[in-house]
């Protein structure tokens, strides 16, 4: 390997340097404190584990995004986590096994074999929160509110939210008796708003069902979409009408809490269709082609771990929030330069200063005093009259 290649990083993999790394870490601590104040408990999951665990349930969508390796000890296939949700679901279902609702949160690096979108990171710092054990819209509203509080904490400007419900399409597709292949084709066409394709795929269905499936292409816009949907989907199965009721209840609560938040409804939005079961939501900002925070309901996610539980949650990339956010992060500046000395009194003084939160940098043998400036020190420890004192560096 040529020397010039040794410092190159793979596409989508980046290192974070000072002071940006400090900003990210401070933001991480602030967000975790926010989660804790809402009653969410932190969990730490393995970076790597057996592949079948990572790709169980919600993880099936992650297959193409998961780096895979062979465990040299067992010979089994392992994967680096590409998302926390399957791991947290296992913790709730198999390890904690609580009877009541469980609120869990996480923050850590994930690794993607394929980027989420063009020019996006393959090593985001994912943070999120998940609420297990309650199937009501109240839990969805809580999780969405916590997501918005996270964006407010980092002061991300000009956010707007998209809301949908995969139960609407799923209920109509089930009533139409679509084969798996046709259901997937129609799903793809709806995501692209491909009207002609949707028309062709639903042409042979009973009139009412065909009309309702075709209506999903057009049922997008402001709050008036929900009233329109009640009319155009009025002959839909009960599960579809219940999904509309849930979506309306969530929208009402959000409008009450956040009257200035723009809400956009898209009943053909099926993000995460393979594992989401209810409401889905995402936050966008101008200039970003991808959502900056997203989530939804994924009931029964723990079934593959032996215990099905309703669940809802959200996730976001901390590095993106720090980049987009306007919140002022106050970084520690300055420090005290400690001379290279074996004096026990000096060491005791340094320990006391550090315990008080002061930053003290040890001078190494041969370093001139000018090195203190490079170490961002503005003061120094000097022995005067038999005592070590902190004085300005210029003195």
Curated annotation (Swiss-Prot):
Q: How does it assemble?
A: Heteromultimer composed of HisG and HisZ subunits.
What would be one Pfam family of this protein? Answer: tRNA-synt_His
UniProt source species:
Pseudomonas putida (strain GB-1)
- Protein name, UniProt field: ATP phosphoribosyltransferase regulatory subunit
- Annotated localization: Cytoplasm
**Record keywords, A-Z:** Amino-acid biosynthesis, Cytoplasm, Histidine biosynthesis
Further details from the record: This function is generally fulfilled by the C-terminal part of HisG, which is missing in some bacteria such as this one.
Which family does the record claim for this protein?
Belongs to the class-II aminoacyl-tRNA synthetase family. HisZ subfamily.
């Amino acid at each position: 390997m040529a020397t010039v290649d040794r410092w190159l990083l793979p596409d989508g993999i980046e290192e974070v340097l000072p002071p940006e790394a400090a900003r990210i870490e401070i933001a991480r601590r602030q967000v975790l404190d926010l989660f804790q104040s809402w009653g969410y408990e932190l969990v730490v999951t393995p970076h790597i584990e057996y592949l079948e665990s990572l790709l169980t349930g919600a993880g099936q969508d992650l297959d193409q995004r998961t780096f895979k390796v062979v465990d040299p000890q067992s010979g089994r296939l392992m994967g680096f986590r590409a998302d926390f949700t399957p791991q947290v679901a296992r913790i709730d279902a198999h390890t904690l096994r609580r009877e009541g609702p469980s609120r869990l949160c996480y923050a850590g690096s994930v690794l993607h074999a394929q980027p989420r979108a063009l020019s996006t990171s393959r090593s985001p710092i994912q943070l999120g929160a998940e609420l297990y054990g309650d199937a009501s819209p109240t839990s969805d509203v809580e999780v969405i509110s916590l997501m918005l509080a996270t964006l407010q904490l980092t002061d991300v400007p000009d956010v707007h939210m998209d809301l949908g419900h995969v139960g609407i399409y799923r209920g109509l597709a089930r009533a139409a008796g679509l084969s798996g292949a046709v259901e997937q084709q129609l799903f793809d066409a709806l995501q692209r708003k491909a009207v002609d394709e949707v028309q062709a795929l639903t042409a042979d269905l009973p009139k009412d069902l065909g009309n309702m499936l075709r209506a999903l292409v057009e049922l997008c816009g402001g709050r008036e979409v929900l009233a329109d949907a009640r009319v155009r989907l009025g002959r839909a199965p009960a599960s579809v009408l219940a999904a509309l009721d849930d979506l309306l209840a969530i929208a009402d609560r959000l409008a009450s809490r956040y009257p200035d938040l723009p809400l956009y409804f898209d009943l053909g939005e099926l993000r995460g269709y393979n594992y989401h079961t209810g409401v889905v939501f995402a936050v966008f900002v101008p200039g970003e082609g991808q959502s900056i925070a997203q989530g939804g309901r994924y009931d029964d996610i723990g079934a593959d771990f032996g215990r099905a539980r309703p669940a809802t949650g959200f996730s976001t990339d901390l590095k993106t929030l720090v980049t987009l956010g306007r919140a002022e992060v106050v970084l520690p500046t300055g420090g005290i330069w400690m001379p290279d000395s074996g004096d026990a009194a000096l060491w005791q003084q340094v320990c006391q200063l550090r315990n008080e939160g002061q930053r003290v940098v040890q001078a190494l043998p041969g370093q001139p005093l000018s090195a203190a400036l490079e170490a961002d020190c503005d003061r120094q420890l000097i022995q005067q009259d038999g005592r070590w004192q902190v004085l300005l560096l210029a003195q």
